[in-house]
């Protein structure tokens, strides 16, 4: 969701900046590790063996109320608009309340299916979230198309047996191991074709060897 549909970089950096400063942890390292992972996974990675329940709750409350500056990524409004009458889902490492708050703040409509981190056991790169979304959408995984911007997310989609297109908002092309990628959703057009949707991914490129 973050940096795939919505750009919440300003809020995320402020939240993790406070946390990193409090614990004398490198903010750069925290931001690199945290993207695409549940908040609790990042806290446990840098400060293992602690009870993070209170800090997790505090960060969630902060992020759910600090929404200024959150916008839709380029092209997202057009793509989501084309999906209004068709099944699509958000699979996110955020909690449900945070996901709904950020999508709404960005001016995007909410899909009927959201699979947040607090409703599954295993986060990305485990495929559980994507498989759950396919189940709720009643669509076979092999017929699902995933757009992801992080390596854990890309791996999760692949592990679910889905087709994956990477978005170069946070991951570098030379890190994609020959996965197709786009710059942003302006490279994508969606149109109905009978009972199905035809997705044209324009300017799909493969990373150089």
What residue spans do the PLM features occupy?
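Conserved G/P- and acidic residue-centered "switch" motifs that form tight phosphate/ATP-binding loops
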Residues: 4, 92, 149
């Amino acid at each position: 969701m973050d940096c795939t549909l919505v750009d919440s970089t300003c809020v995320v950096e402020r939240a993790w900046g406070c946390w990193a400063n409090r614990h004398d942890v490198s903010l750069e390292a925290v931001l690199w590790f945290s993207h695409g992972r549940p908040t609790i996974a990042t806290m446990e990675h840098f400060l293992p063996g602690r009870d993070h329940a209170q800090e997790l709750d505090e960060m969630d409350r902060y992020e759910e109320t600090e929404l200024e500056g959150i916008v839709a990524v380029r092209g997202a409004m057009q793509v989501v608009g084309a999906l209004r009458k068709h099944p699509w889902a958000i699979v996110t490492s955020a909690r449900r309340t945070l996901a709904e708050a950020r999508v709404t703040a960005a001016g995007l409509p909410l899909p009927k299916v959201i699979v947040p981190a607090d409703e599954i056991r295993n986060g990305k790169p485990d495929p559980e979230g994507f498989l759950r979304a396919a189940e709720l959408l009643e669509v076979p995984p092999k017929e699902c198309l995933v757009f992801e911007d992080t390596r854990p997310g890309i791996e999760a989609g692949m592990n679910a047996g889905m087709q994956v297109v990477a978005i170069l908002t946070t991951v570098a092309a030379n890190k994609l191991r020959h996965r197709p990628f786009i710059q942003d959703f302006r490279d994508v057009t969606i149109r109905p074709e009978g009972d199905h949707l035809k997705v044209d991914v324009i300017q799909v490129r493969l990373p150089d060897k």
